[in-house]
Curated annotation (Swiss-Prot):
The keyword Membrane applies. Pfam families: ABC_tran. It is found in: Cell membrane. The lineage of its organism: Archaea, Methanobacteriati, Methanobacteriota, Methanomada group, Methanococci. ATP-binding (A) component of a common energy-coupling factor (ECF) ABC-transporter complex. Unlike classic ABC transporters this ECF transporter provides the energy necessary to transport a number of different substrates. It is a peripheral membrane protein. One of its GO terms (cellular component) is ATP-binding cassette (ABC) transporter complex. GO terms for molecular function: ATP binding; ATP hydrolysis activity; ATPase-coupled transmembrane transporter activity. ATP binds at residues 37-44. This is Energy-coupling factor transporter ATP-binding protein EcfA. The gene is ecfA. Forms a stable energy-coupling factor (ECF) transporter complex composed of 2 membrane-embedded substrate-binding proteins (S component), 2 ATP-binding proteins (A component) and 2 transmembrane proteins (T component). It comes from Methanocaldococcus jannaschii (strain ATCC 43067 / DSM 2661 / JAL-1 / JCM 10045 / NBRC 100440) (Methanococcus jannaschii). Its EC number is 7.-.-.-. It comes from the Archaea.
Length: 279
């Protein structure tokens, strides 16, 4: 059984624009999955189906094996399981202080005050934002706002966190910190689904990758399986990770037959092995 699954999912906006065109997407409990695609591929629209914000034109979304029902009571249960973090944290953060914002979700669950305070404290600690409880969110940096948005979802204690472009607008250091946070949450058992077009981060963190283009899934598999399909990557208007592109150049232009790798560690090992063999 998959914790999140879509079957033959189609979606059209009221003006008739077709955005999703037969999406089949499966995530197992405990996985960290990346959805890769250029802007306009339909990634955000797909994610809005995972907790029932959007309703498919055709097909279905299943959470823990059960199709989503769109009555109010059923959607509350779905959103206890699947938490969604928007690309722009300013779309999600609205309370006067960090503490109040993170507390908003648990309070809406009707939890007692003591439990809400406990969850807020734990969530802020998990994202490294202890000490910011009384800060106004608009005084925070972009990376700090992302962390507060994630904390707000963590405080709901979902089984799955879905993040739309979590590194968008961040500098490289900020992006790495957010991805390390998500990686650590995943290692503690949280199922993580992210959308991104940052191909350099994906091989480092993801268990499984989907490539999306023009409302369709072009490829799925491990990072190695996906990035080895260079033709599909370029068809989706994406590029190879920079280290893999270096190997491609060495292979094709310099006739140096170094084995493919997709992270710095893999490529370093493959280059060292090649040099040892040559010596």
């Amino acid at each position: 059984m998959y914790i999140v699954e879509t079957k033959d999912l189609y979606f059209r906006y009221p003006d008739g624009t077709a955005v999703l065109k037969g999406i089949n997407f499966k995530v197992k409990k405990g996985e960290m999955v990346s959805l890769l695609g250029p802007n306009g591929a339909g990634k955000s629209t797909l994610f809005l189906h995972f907790n029932g914000i959007l309703r498919p034109t055709k097909g279905e979304v299943l959470i823990k094996g059960k199709p989503i029902k769109y009555d109010k009571k059923s959607l509350v249960e779905v959103r206890k399981t699947v938490g969604l973090v928007f690309q722009n944290p300013d779309d999600q953060i609205f309370a006067p202080t960090v503490k109040e914002d993170v507390a908003f979700g648990p309070l809406n669950l009707g939890l007692p005050k003591e439990e809400v305070e406990k969850r807020v404290k734990e969530a802020l600690k998990a994202v490294g934002m202890e000490g910011f409880e009384n800060k106004p969110p608009h005084h925070l940096s972009g990376g700090q706002k992302k962390r507060v948005a994630i904390a707000g979802i963590l405080a709901m204690q979902p089984e799955v966190i879905v993040l739309d472009e979590p590194t968008a607008g961040l500098d490289p250091v900020g992006a790495s910190k957010i991805m390390k946070l998500l990686y650590d949450l995943n290692k503690k058992g949280m199922t993580i689904i992210i959308s991104t077009h940052d191909v350099d981060l994906v091989p480092v963190y993801a268990d499984k990758v989907y490539v999306m283009y023009d409302g369709k899934i072009l490829k799925e598999g491990t990072p190695k399986e996906v990035f080895s399909d260079v033709e599909t990557i370029r068809k989706a208007n994406l590029r190879l990770p920079r280290v893999a592109h270096l190997i491609e150049i060495l292979n094709k232009k310099d006739n140096i037959p170094i084995e493919w790798g997709f992270t710095i560690g893999e490529v370093r090992r493959n280059i060292v092995n090649y040099l040892k063999e040559k010596c």
